[in-house]
């Protein structure tokens, strides 16, 4: 998800990067804030945020799993029903209050869509999410692809990477990507051995990483929350979690 959203049921981890490379887990400082409510809190009187009008319905009838945006469009990703790793992306371009253009594309056998992000290079937007699902391993790779109206992609995108753990060298499953604000780095999150890891890669031309050569590898203990997504911004990683039955 892109930058600066206030979200219900959240557990923020601010991860301070240090000198950590492939073989060493990074020492981090975790800062948390938990909201124990199931309803959206009222905005403060001083807030400039106001819901004026509902704008559009999305192309699928399930919860939004994640979303991202570039300078022209918003992209929302949802599971489709019945769920077998199939996803749908709705692209929305707003043209003023109550006016918009909407279309969609489908992703078959991709996974759970825990994270959707985008990179921009030479004026081209590349969307990134988990892919290559199989059984309970909802994503065994990450994929990058250009948005194409009414197009269906199967299993993975134009570019896809399997992600090995930098220490064990084993390929990881349940992998999710996030891109920093200037499309120069990618973070990939996965769980392994009861812990959660984030590997940071240099991103060339908004598309290319060396999956065996992360510039940082961060390790955190497992948390009690239900992981919902994360983002990479500057030198920090922000995660969002909630309880399975009460988050959104």
Tell where the protein language model's regions lie, with residue ranges.
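Loop/turn-rich, solvent-exposed surfaces of beta-rich toroidal or solenoidal domains
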Residues: 220-248
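Hydrophobic, aromatic-enriched interface-forming segments
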Residues: 166-222
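Sec-dependent N-terminal signal peptides of Gram-positive bacterial secreted proteins and lipoproteins
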Residues: 1-29
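Asp-box/WD-like beta-propeller blade repeats and closely related beta-sheet repeat scaffolds
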Residues: 46-52, 140-179
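Structural motif
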Residues: 80-92, 134-148, 193-202, 243-248
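Surface loop/turn motifs at the tips and blade-to-blade linkers of beta-strand repeat domains
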Residues: 55-61, 104-109, 160-171, 218-223
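Beta-propeller domains
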Residues: 32-56, 65-108, 245-248
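Structural signature of eukaryotic scaffold interfaces centered on beta-propeller domains
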Residues: 57-71, 112-128, 168-185, 226-234
